[in-house]
UniProtKB/Swiss-Prot annotation:
Residues 18-134 are annotated as: 3 X 39 AA approximate tandem repeats. There is a cross-link at K26, K302, K313, K431 (Glycyl lysine isopeptide (Lys-Gly) (interchain with G-Cter in SUMO2)). The lineage of its organism: Eukaryota, Metazoa, Chordata, Craniata, Vertebrata. This is Zinc finger and SCAN domain-containing protein 21. GO terms for cellular component: nucleus. Residues 122-204 form the SCAN box domain. One of its GO terms (molecular function) is DNA binding. Residues 210-240 have a biased composition (Polar residues). Belongs to the krueppel C2H2-type zinc-finger protein family.
Length: 555
């Protein structure tokens, strides 16, 4: 690069300009006396005293080269001649002689100061406001400048610019917390952003994962975020010294966040966060005063990888909110990993395919696709009815049946019978009417007896087979129906859950309670199809029907 020491030879005699006063070269030399190195000033003084300002031969090429090399790093911003200076002082014709290196000096100096990162340039372009400019034309011009600073069309190809736009749109459609997390890693392409997200999913899905990178790498990552335009600062020296004390570190559970008004602030020392495994002798005494609520929460969480986030390192509240949501989400996944570890530990090759029935009943051999259906099916063998109606005490083996039954207590009963009884469902009315008409579509093949319901036929068929699957644990007595076992067990416990609200009388079976309750209501649901007479119990109806059949007298 050509310096001022060689300017006299290149420029030649200055054009006559009487009004300009002192020589511009002299002015520049005087201004540079205090700024530039003393070696260069001595060389200028030597030339003026010798009177040989038109030649540089007395110094020799080696001396000139030495001065140029010596002053290259010290005086470069002050000695380079700009294009504006040549035009002002009449040396425009010598620009071609100086070459492109001197002319481009100012541009090189601007580059040395450092260009903003692509993310900062993008944010400047996107966040530029109309109120920042005096008018629309200035706003448009400024937008063009900011767009060029971001996309850099002078160095990027069309494909690279397209990739930048695709990357920006891809980050826009991501959830807020994932968007901020990916931006912190400064991906250069959409493919790199996808790779980062896939790696994050694997980390969250792998139980018991440990951090293997040393703390100094963590520090470098934070410093990289700071220089790349994120609103974060590098780790403080105090935090770095604490972290560097141990070669490896682990994290248990999520980061705990302290709420201060509306703002959420992370605990300042990462080693003080709940569950961080460190040397007990170096723990701060404040750790002993952690609330029992935090400790109980941390004990129930599975070990997981959580990035160390310094306190107050977020530049906006939205980023702090992102951190809160991200840690909360990770903590939720970690808490579920323990319950799902049995399934998660199972190899993918042994997992059931869709529609495959791997759950088999040990009693009858029936297969099911999931364990919940098998559990429901087993209740048909055990007779278990864990779902009890709080209104009438009726028990059911499935929650769905209880839900349907409970509606009869809450909603209207639009389906009425001639006997005055009402039902919430038409199917219940049909079953009830079979009692009046004595319709019995379900017939036993062994004895020919017919029943109005399929369940009644199944219970009756056990008389022929002698099956009594329901056994009392107290006395060992067996029953063919679960209702019989339930009634029998109340003899041991003395329980009488069915109590009449009218007179206070209690019963150990719902059928006895229903018969008694009809005394107060006057309900007579059983009526004779021959004469239309009604009765409050089925036994009374049977006795009456003997008159019509000739088997007995009317009671």
């Amino acid at each position: 690069m050509t310096k001022v020491v060689g300017m006299a030879t290149v420029l030649g005699p200055r054009p006559p300009q009487e009004s300009m006063g002192p020589s511009p070269i002299k002015v520049e030399e005087d201004e540079e006396k205090d700024k530039c190195c003393p070696t260069l000033e001595l060389s200028h003084k030597h030339f003026r005293q010798s009177g040989n300002q038109d030649t540089l031969e007395p110094m020799g090429p080696s001396t000139i080269k030495a001065e140029e090399d010596e002053s290259k790093d010290k005086c470069r911003p002050n000695l380079e001649i700009s294009r504006k200076s040549f035009k002002q002082f009449g040396y425009q014709d010598t620009l071609e002689q100086l070459g492109p290196s001197t002319i481009k000096a100012e541009e090189d100096d601007e580059k040395d100061k450092g260009h903003p990162s692509p993310e900062i340039s993008r944010q400047r372009f996107r966040q530029f406001g109309y109120h920042d400019t005096p008018g629309p034309r200035e706003a448009l011009s400024q937008l063009r400048v900011l767009c060029c600073e971001w996309l850099q069309p002078e160095i990027h190809t069309k494909e690279q610019i397209l990739e930048l736009l695709v990357l920006e749109q891809f980050l826009t459609i991501l959830p807020r917390e994932l968007q901020t997390w990916v931006q912190q890693h400064c991906p250069e392409s959409a493919e790199e952003a996808v790779t980062l997200l896939e790696d994050l999913e694997q980390e969250l899905d792998e139980p018991g994962l440990q951090v293997s990178s040393p703390p100094n790498e963590q520090k470098q990552s934070w410093e990289k975020m700071s220089t790349s335009g994120t609103a974060m600062e590098s780790l403080s020296s105090t935090e770095t010294q604490h972290v560097d004390a141990s070669p490896k570190y682990e994290f248990w559970g999520p980061l705990y966040i302290q709420e201060t008004g509306e703002e959420e602030v992370f605990t300042q020392d990462p080693r003080k966060r709940q569950g961080f495994k460190s040397n007990p002798q170096k723990e701060d005494s404040a750790d002993e005063h952690r609330s029992s609520e935090e400790e109980s929460h941390a004990d129930g969480l599975k070990r997981t990888v959580i990035p160390m986030i310094p306190a107050n390192k977020y530049g906006s509240r939205s980023e702090r909110q992102w951190a809160n949501n991200l840690e909360r989400e990770r903590g939720t996944k970690a808490s579920l990993q323990d319950t799902g570890s049995r399934k998660g530990a199972e190899p993918a090759s042994t997992r059931p395919a869709p529609g495959e029935k791997r759950y088999i009943c040990a009693e009858c051999g029936k297969a099911f696709s999931n364990s919940s259906n098998l559990t429901k099916h087993r209740r048909t063998h055990t007779g278990e009815k864990p779902y009890v109606c709080t209104k009438c005490g009726k028990a059911f083996s499935h929650s769905s049946n209880l839900t349907l039954h409970y509606r009869t207590h809450l909603v209207d009963r639009p389906y009425d019978c001639k006997c005055g009884k009402a039902f919430g469902q038409s199917s219940d009315l049909l079953k009830h009417q079979r009692m009046h008409t004595e319709e019995a579509p379900y017939q036993c093949k062994d004895c020919g007896k017919a029943f109005s319901g399929k369940g009644s036929l199944i219970r009756h068929y056990r008389i022929h087979t002698g099956e009594k699957p329901y056994q009392c644990n107290e006395c060992g007595k067996s029953f063919s129906q679960h209702a019989g076992l339930s009634s029998h067990q109340r003899l041991h416990t003395g329980e009488k859950p069915y109590k009449c609200k009218e007179c206070g009388k209690a019963f150990n079976h719902s059928s006895n309670f229903n018969k008694h309750h009809r005394i107060h209501t006057g309900e007579k649901p059983y009526w004779c199809s021959h004469c239309g007479k009604t009765f409050c119990s089925k036994s009374n109806l049977s006795k009456h029907q003997r008159v019509h059949t000739g088997e007995g007298e009317v009671q």
